[in-house]
Regions:
Chain B
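N-terminal secretory signal peptides and thylakoid transit peptides that target proteins
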Residues: 1-17
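Onset of an N-terminal alpha helix
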Residues: 3-7, 44-51
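Boundary at the C-terminal end of the N-terminal hydrophobic targeting segment
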Residues: 26-28
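Short N-terminal segments immediately surrounding and downstream of signal-peptide cleavage
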Residues: 31-45
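Mature-region segments of soluble proteins
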Residues: 35-36, 48-53, 64, 68-241
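Substrate-recognition/specificity elements adjacent to catalytic centers across diverse enzyme folds
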Residues: 57
Length: 592, 241
């Protein structure tokens, strides 16, 4: 028997960045919110303290903060002529679970999209002609930079972002990113300290005519009271950042930045260890009536609600839509349908820089967002004429993850084990930095998400099936951006050797094994045309007007940036329209 | 090179004075003999000797300890006995198919059963790895790393090698609370100061940070971590002559 609970105003699936932001904003607007989260309750104060949290085996290798593939995974193949098999072990990406979601173990690299990124199709078509987009499902987002700016700015104030503005109200500022869209206000906090390799990268990039700046960081640099009145403290550069929770209250996360200021709100209720199985629909299929979930005792419960918010992370939002029959599934044969369409990822490459003994990188001193970056080869910040690709990526010397089990840089041609390997690890550990090329990812018709015909999860539901390989466009992009990174690396002082790795190298297929990024995007994209988007420009489903969708599943194609800044800008934009329009008069906010 | 294997064994023994007076062949038989008396949690003595031999090819002794000297076999034993070895974090529902390398782990084995069955099949019939001379042990590991020339039934060779090599590195470099990285051997080697981490004043300085390592369970004033992994075990796996 399914137990039915009293109706609530809003039910929110997932207690990560987007779910808790939705709860806070809607609770303040007088809506009774029930947040349903499948993982455990936890808190920075009680769960993430050093030194116990500084356990690389437990958190970075065994991944105790992340999803457990036994209860949640997907199946994967490179192309639709293969048989998808389950991702049996975590690898390429590490979705979160529990209070705060992946937001507790993110790096905190906090970006904004470029104005041109948000109108990618029309921008490229105008500048280069339509042909440059042949074969690509590249689309406009349907929402502009100017519309998102106040919300991007607000999220900077939730996180206490540290950085140097490059464009303040249209005025170019020294030391910042000159390519960024105009900011209405400066960063709330000054940039992080630059380690010696970052200083060298900055000097060389400058000499080569590029525009280096310190990466925008949600590893806070000063004591800071955020927009909700929560208190953050300065980062200690402890080096146990991404994959770990921060016990210093220094990494902006959804628990200390939002949960703490909404937890006692009369309109807020949180149900932990509860797995939402599906969204239920009304008889006519036009609206959702609530969600069915398994409570902490494993009993099936129906929570009716006037409004449903999907905040379960990009991949699992799409999964919930598919198992609930929300929207129309994408069919790669006909190109029709939208749910699962335009799945994209992040295209990563890197140059490794091996210094002589004069340069001490001390890689264990680091922070998730400690980086010196150039944006000269991102988006359309450079001329794409005759390059054969669209998009780009930022190039950044990052000092983020120099922990002893995972970080063993060795110069090219070193054997991969044995005496020479051991010697090389010893000699290079303290004298190396990685320069990352963090590249965009276009959408193409053959990359998509649907349901697996064979494999089922612990709840008897079909696994989400991912079909993905790096499109030719992105292989060319990645090779190009990597060649620029390599040039910088070779021009740096005190460099003995340079190595390179390119995940999207010609002839190599995308693999779910090595970690790349937890930046899965698309599958339920935003737009103004219901035949190519799942939600309208307000994040509202075209087919079910009381379902609102949050997260990187909204991205029509992936940016050359990390997703959380952009997706939180979208979240606050959607919440703004819910609070100030939809909830007073529930209806489709755009005509289909 | 008639003397090669003996020389290799002597090199393998490193600083141990006994090596000079004991014939190489006898040494080989006794190599890792101490492992026999260990109260293993998962491994048996012959599996432990196989893993010690292989681990010491992957991370041999030089100015710094070999893998087995740093407690890597203890570490692996405890890991295989624990949740990771027993398949926590692995989705093991069928049907099973070989898949492509890009699809990752596709065997029905848990890490513990993968390694148990893998070793059993590798050691079936021929000379045991522990009894080979250093040169042949290296050659064996080289072949295993490339997956060349082995048929291990339902144990995928590449997966087996990758799993053991990952465990060896984890055992050499993880916090000593898990039984490896004994006396901070791995951390001393690379200059990693450990879990107690506060670097605000140093991060922008181009200078070494000469702090002795401190693990999660560091015992103040000793240069060691408390042996929280298995208090009963006094000795780690060590090559003996
Ligand atoms: C190691 C790592 C580093 C990262 N670094 C960066 C970075 O530097 N910069 C950046 O921009 N981004 C980064 N990210 C990505 C960032 O964490 C995500 O973009 C962000 O957390 C997304 O927020 P979300 O609310 O959409 O989803 P999540 O934070 O994933 O939250 C979703 C929540 O929903 C819950 N849930 C899912 N399904 C169900 C269900 N059926 N029932 C109930 N609950 C459910 C999950 O348990 C989870 O808690 C990183 C991610 C990882 C893993
Ligand atoms: S590096 Fe800074 S922000 Fe990251 S976990 Fe350590 S103290 Fe927190």
């Amino acid at each position: 028997m399914v137990r039915e609970l009293p109706k609530t105003d809003v039910v929110i699936v997932g207690a990560g960045w987007t779910g808790l932001a939705a709860a806070k904003e809607l609770a303040d607007a007088g809506q009774r919110c029930v947040v349903i989260e499948r993982g455990d309750w936890r808190h920075d104060a009680s769960n993430f303290g050093a030194p116990e949290e500084h356990d690389e085996l437990k958190y970075a290798r065994r991944k105790e903060h992340m999803i457990d593939t036994q209860t949640k995974t997907l199946s994967f193949r490179n192309s639709s002529d293969q048989t998808a098999l389950p991702m049996r072990r975590l690898g390429s990406f590490l979705p979160g679970k529990g209070l705060g979601g992946a937001g507790i173990h993110w790096n905190g690299q906090l970006w904004r999209p470029l104005p041109s990124d948000l109108k990618m199709r029309s921008h490229y078509a105008d500048r280069y002609g339509e042909a440059i987009l042949d074969g690509l499902n590249v689309q406009d987002w349907g929402v502009t930079y100017d519309e998102l700016e106040p919300h991007l700015d607000f999220f900077d104030r939730v996180c206490g972002t540290a950085g140097v503005a490059g464009n303040l109200n249209g005025e170019t500022k020294e030391g910042g990113n000159p390519f960024e869209g105009p900011r209405s206000a400066d960063y709330p906090n000054p940039p992080m300290k630059a380690s010696p390799p970052l200083q060298l990268f900055q000097k060389t990039a400058q000499e080569m005519g590029y525009h280096p700046f310190q990466m925008p960081s949600a590893n806070v640099t000063k004591a800071y009271e955020n927009a909700y009145g929560a208190q953050l403290h300065p980062c200690t550069y402890c080096g146990f950042c991404e994959r770990f929770g921060c016990g210093y209250y220094a990494k902006a996360d959804p628990i200390i930045c939002i949960y703490d200021v909404v937890k006692d709100h009369e309109n807020f209720e949180l149900r932990m260890n509860s797995q939402v199985l599906r969204v239920e629909k009304s008889a006519d299929g036009k609206t959702a009536t609530g969600v069915t979930y398994l409570d902490e005792r494993g009993q099936e419960v129906f929570q009716p609600a006037d409004t449903v918010c999907l905040n379960a992370y990009a991949l699992w939002n799409v999964h919930l839509m598919l198992v609930s029959g929300l929207g129309k599934p994408y069919d790669p044969e006909t190109g029709e349908g939208t749910v699962g369409r335009n799945y994209a990822y992040q295209t990563l490459a890197a140059a490794g820089v091996f210094f002589d003994k004069e340069v001490w990188s001390n890689p264990f001193m680091g922070a998730g967002a400690l980086g010196m970056t150039i944006d000269d080869f991102n988006g359309d910040n450079f001329d794409h004429t005759d390059l054969g690709f669209v998009g780009g990526g930022y190039i950044s010397a990052n000092q983020t993850n120099g922990r002893p089990i995972n970080y063993h840089p060795t110069p090219p041609d070193t054997p991969s084990w044995g005496p020479e390997w051991k010697k090389a690890v010893r000699e290079n550990y303290l004298h190396h930095v990685g320069i990352v090329c963090h590249g965009s990812s276009v959408a193409v018709p053959g990359n998509y998400l649907d349901l697996d015909p064979t494999y089922k999860d612990a709840y008897g539901q079909p696994l989400l099936r991912m079909t993905f390989d790096f499109p030719e466009n992105d292989r060319r992009m990645s090779a190009y951006v990597l060649s620029k990174a390599e040039e910088i690396a070779r021009n740096m002082d005190n460099v003995r050797a340079v190595s390179t790795v390119n995940r999207a190298a010609e002839g190599e297929s995308y693999s779910v094994v090595p970690y790349q990024t937890t930046h899965n995007t698309g599958g339920a994209v935003i737009g103004t045309d219901p035949t190519t988007s799942v939600v309208n420009r307000y994040g509202q489903m075209w087919d079910h007007h009381n379902v609102f969708v949050f997260g990187a599943c909204l991205f029509p194609q992936n940016l050359g940036y990390n997703p959380t800044g952009p997706l939180m800008g979208l979240a606050y934009w959607t919440l703004d329209h819910m609070k100030n329009d939809y909830l007073q008069n529930p209806r489709p906010l755009m005509d289909a | 090179m008639p003397n090669f294997s003996r020389r290799a064994v002597l090199l393998q023994i490193g600083a141990s004075g006994l090596a000079a007076v004991t014939p190489g062949a006898a040494l080989a038989q006794n190599r890792y003999a101490a492992l026999d008396t260990q109260p293993w949690s998962y491994l048996d003595g012959s599996e432990a000797r196989f893993l010690a031999s292989m681990a010491d090819v992957l991370i041999p002794e030089d100015d710094f300890p070999s893998a087995s000297q740093a407690g890597v076999v203890d570490f692996i034993d405890l890991q295989l006995a624990g949740p990771y070895g027993q398949g926590a974090g692995l989705f093991l529902e069928g049907p099973f198919a070989d898949g492509t390398p890009e699809q990752g782990w596709q065997t029905a084995h848990t890490p513990a059963s993968l390694i148990r069955n893998g070793i059993a099949r590798l050691e079936d019939g021929g000379t045991r790895l522990v009894d080979l001379d250093a040169n042949d042990r290296s050659a064996f590991v080289e072949r295993l790393s490339k997956g060349e020339g082995f048929d291990l039934g339902d144990v995928p060779v590449q997966t087996l090698f990758d799993e053991i090599w990952a465990l060896v590195k984890e055992g050499y470099f993880s916090d000593p609370i898990y039984g490896g990285n004994k006396d901070y051997a791995g951390w001393e080697m690379i200059g990693f100061p450990g879990a107690h981490a506060y670097y605000t004043d140093h991060v922008d300085k181009n200078a070494p940070f000469p702090a002795p390592p401190k693990g999660i369970a560091h015992v103040p004033g000793t240069g060691r971590s408390a042996d929280t992994a298995r208090p009963l075990r006094a000795q780690t796996a060590r090559e003996e002559g």
